[in-house]
Amino acid sequence: MEQDKKNAKVGQSSPPYADSPNVTANGGTAGGRRHRARRKEDKPRQERELMLRCMYHTVPGRVLLKMLSGRRFSALCGRFMDSSLSRPLIRRFVRKNHIDLNEYTATRYRSFNDCFTRRIRAEMRPIPHNPRALIAPCDGRLSAYRISDGLVMPIKQSWYSVSDLLGGDPIAEAYRNGVCLVFRLCVDNYHRYCYIDNGTKGRNVFLPGQLHTVRPIALSRIPVFIRNCREYTVMDTAAFGPVTQIEVGALLVGKILNHDAEARVHRGAEKGMFLYGGSTIVLLLREGAADLPDALFEKTARGEETPVRMGEILGYAHKK
């Protein structure tokens, strides 16, 4: 049974999607309908990719990028997004990203950021009862990396040391030969995140920096995770021992809001949230802390990301 758990596929707790009939009542095929829906869904992402390609690959774009990636511009944008003046943006954002507001605790919002940080209904992100389950702290696209003996890992064509990620904190040594899990959140993802286990947490450490996008187009050109502003927390967890969680800001994300200072925490409880934009969460686990499916690392090595939801089972604590 344990072997079955170990080899379980990431995504096992996601709700299954029912297949549509092959032929619709009006004679059209369900496959064609799904294709049109996918095409419509991909259009906003394609528009964003085109804009970012211009910003990172052209001289005028890089001039604009220098202004947009600064914290001063992000703070100005944040003030607007917090104000009632931003409310007209909500309807288009919801429609463009196919967000079902019925999945959330509120359907009316005071500002754009109020909508962006909307709280989801508990039943939409159930937390598994198995105390050994390693869960995703957030919605997003997951990549998994093994940390080499030299505390270095290749993430999206850039090499990072754990020490650099943590601003030189000596705790980096605890993750020698461990695992690094990177969760990339897009604008259409749920932007609140939770604790992965019961335990105690230390203080929140903020490291100032810039605010580049966390999309692959930037990750392949700039060492984003050590350039961007970020905040990390060291947690002593019941099932996995010491775990460090890093929240990384991104383009136009000027605020990372963590709720607790040093405290006892519980798995599934809300840890914090990002304000407007895409963003990233990085989890560092020590060697042997958890058993994760090899398929996850193989998929990452092929340059593919795995969509996950907050509370989804990724693996299990290593049985001693």
Residue ranges and their predicted role:
Residues 2-11, 16-320:
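Contiguous, well-folded functional domains in the mature portion of proteins
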